[in-house]
Amino acid sequence: MALTIHCNIVSAEQEIFSGLVELLVAAATEGDVGIGYGHAPFLSALKPGPVRVKKQSGDEEIFYVSGGYLEVQPESINVLADTALRADDMDEASAEAAKKEAEEALASQTGDGIDYSKAAARLAEAAAQLRTLQAIRKRAR
């Protein structure tokens, strides 16, 4: 049996996951990080994208976070997300529609930097949701 650490994944709205995990993999601003039992204390901002957890049972679960922070303490891992969803609850059609809408908004920009930045952020978030859904499909194969 592998060593485990307690993991919490929470959003501003609710707790999404709480339990013992062998490994958590997330997209930090410095690059992808893998956190397991015995990892050094660590704090990093998270990029939008998938967060994978390998549970104590050996099952793997994937979550989508729109950004936030990853905190590693000696006894726990905390993912503090702006928005967090179980990847199984995500809808590919709505993610595709959001991506298309953001691409159209970017194409129609006339120079207002604020609207451009918002559209670029929406596009990055939609693309991250689609990457998360693709990770689920790969796992199912």
UniProtKB/Swiss-Prot annotation:
F-type ATPases have 2 components, CF(1) - the catalytic core - and CF(0) - the membrane proton channel. CF(1) has five subunits: alpha(3), beta(3), gamma(1), delta(1), epsilon(1). CF(0) has three main subunits: a, b and c. GO terms for molecular function: ATP binding; proton-transporting ATP synthase activity, rotational mechanism. It holds the Pfam family ATP-synt_DE. InterPro entries: ATP_F1_dsu/esu_C_sf (IPR036794), ATP_synth_F1_dsu/esu (IPR001469), ATP_synth_F1_dsu/esu_N (IPR020546), ATP_synth_F1_esu_C (IPR020547), ATPsynth_dsu/esu_N (IPR036771). The gene is atpC. GO terms for cellular component: plasma membrane; proton-transporting ATP synthase complex. Signal peptide: none annotated. Transmembrane segments: none annotated. Produces ATP from ADP in the presence of a proton gradient across the membrane. The keyword Metal-binding does not apply. Belongs to the ATPase epsilon chain family. HAMAP family: ATP_synth_epsil_bac. This is ATP synthase epsilon chain. It is found in: Cell inner membrane. Its main location: membrane. Keywords: ATP synthesis, Cell inner membrane, Cell membrane, CF(1), Hydrogen ion transport, Ion transport, Membrane, Transport. It is a peripheral membrane protein.
